[in-house]
């Protein structure tokens, strides 16, 4: 006789597995980002800016799935530390663009060790991580579409 998994059993919940993995990532990243003097959300801001310096605040929020009420204080704290600067768009003054300062750009070299440490900790093949990341992107897209 086979028993069907209880759909309300915690360990059978996909959402709990993702939630628990998120917490494990946070614990793993914290000491590494503390050494850089930044938090995980700030790290994400830098990752976007290292790809697209001069992006608008709105585009940054869209890229990170965060609203302006979350992005603005994050950006202001980094600006106060001299790691980035905000500037009104020359063509549309309603838009604010975010630019890295030399100090913010310089943080990239130190941050390169973080994803390398993640890869080491996860072990396995790079393709495994790529496949998992793609599955998680698809999961987010499907949940967004169903919301």
What are these regions (language model features)?
Residues 16, 23, 27-67:
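N-terminal helix-turn-helix DNA-binding core of bacterial DNA-binding proteins
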Residues 141-147:
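Generic C-terminal helix-cap and adjacent flexible tail
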Residues 57-58, 69, 76, 96:
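Residues within helix-turn-helix
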């Amino acid at each position: 006789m086979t028993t069907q998994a209880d759909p309300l059993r915690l360990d059978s919940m996909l959402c709990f597995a993702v939630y628990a993995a998120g917490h494990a990532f946070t614990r793993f990243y914290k000491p590494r980002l503390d050494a850089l003097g930044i938090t995980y959300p700030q790290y994400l801001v830098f990752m976007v800016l290292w790809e697209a310096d001069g992006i608008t605040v709105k585009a940054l929020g869209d890229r990170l799935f965060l609203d302006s009420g979350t992005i603005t204080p994050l950006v202001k704290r980094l600006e106060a530390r001299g790691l980035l600067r905000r500037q009104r768009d020359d063509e549309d003054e309603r838009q604010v663009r975010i630019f890295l300062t030399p100090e913010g750009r310089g943080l990239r070299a130190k941050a390169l060790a973080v994803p390398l440490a993640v890869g080491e900790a996860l072990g396995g093949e790079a393709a495994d991580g790529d496949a998992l990341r793609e599955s998680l992107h698809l999961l987010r897209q499907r949940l967004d579409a169903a919301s």
